Amino acid sequence: NRPYSFGL
């Protein structure tokens, strides 16, 4: 999981 929660 990425440190940011975007739908990229």
Curated annotation (Swiss-Prot):
It is found in: Secreted. GO terms for biological process: neuropeptide signaling pathway. Keywords: Amidation, Neuropeptide, Secreted. It comes from the Eukaryota. The keyword Manganese does not apply. May act as a neurotransmitter or neuromodulator. This is Allatostatin-A2. It comes from Delia radicum (Cabbage root fly).
